[in-house]
Amino acid sequence: MHNNYKIAKVYAEGLFEIANTKNSLAEINEQLNSIKSVLKQMPEFYYFLVNPLISQQIKKNTIKIVFNNNLDKITLNFLLILIERRRIIYFYDIVDQFILIWNKATNTSVVEIASVISLTEKQQQYLINKLKEITKANYIKLKLKIDPSLIGGLIIKFGSNLIDLSLKGKLKNSPYI
């Protein structure tokens, strides 16, 4: 088993347990996703946090200034612990593991949908309702992607399942072509 995975899983499980006992799971899940998004949009900030030449104290102070009262105490302390233990480099993996644990605990199924054009809210809601029936999940989280090469229709992926409703797929599998 990959070492990053093991480390990330341990920290994610620990954070999940603490957040669960404090009834802060939804808030912390949202905050972790927001922080991950900020770090992805500002890679210089991430590189600053993982740089071993910068002191832990400077990193901690920077975290406190940047997120100044915008984070739950649990999330803030978690970030500070990651910095202190030199585990901030695993932050993305930890968030990914936390999301997996969250999805399992809330019976959420993540579904990737590729389409030629953007789906309307009504179309998304229709798909969510149908996918709940198919997957027996309480919640469906859609990851939407535009793929003009499909010509028309959709490709739906969840778990190890793939449903190809695209015109490209139908043409590819047609015995007449």
Swiss-Prot record:
Keywords: ATP synthesis, CF(1), Chloroplast, Hydrogen ion transport, Ion transport, Membrane, Plastid, Thylakoid, Transport. Pfam families: OSCP. It is found in: Plastid, Chloroplast thylakoid membrane. GO terms for cellular component: chloroplast thylakoid membrane; proton-transporting ATP synthase complex. One of its GO terms (molecular function) is proton-transporting ATP synthase activity, rotational mechanism. It is a peripheral membrane protein. Belongs to the ATPase delta chain family. F(1)F(0) ATP synthase produces ATP from ADP in the presence of a proton or sodium gradient. F-type ATPases consist of two structural domains, F(1) containing the extramembraneous catalytic core and F(0) containing the membrane proton channel, linked together by a central stalk and a peripheral stalk. During catalysis, ATP synthesis in the catalytic domain of F(1) is coupled via a rotary mechanism of the central stalk subunits to proton translocation. NCBIfam families: ATP_synt_delta. F-type ATPases have 2 components, F(1) - the catalytic core - and F(0) - the membrane proton channel. F(1) has five subunits: alpha(3), beta(3), gamma(1), delta(1), epsilon(1). CF(0) has four main subunits: a(1), b(1), b'(1) and c(10-14). The alpha and beta chains form an alternating ring which encloses part of the gamma chain. F(1) is attached to F(0) by a central stalk formed by the gamma and epsilon chains, while a peripheral stalk is formed by the delta, b and b' chains. HAMAP family: ATP_synth_delta_bact. PANTHER family: ATP SYNTHASE DELTA CHAIN. This is ATP synthase subunit delta, chloroplastic.
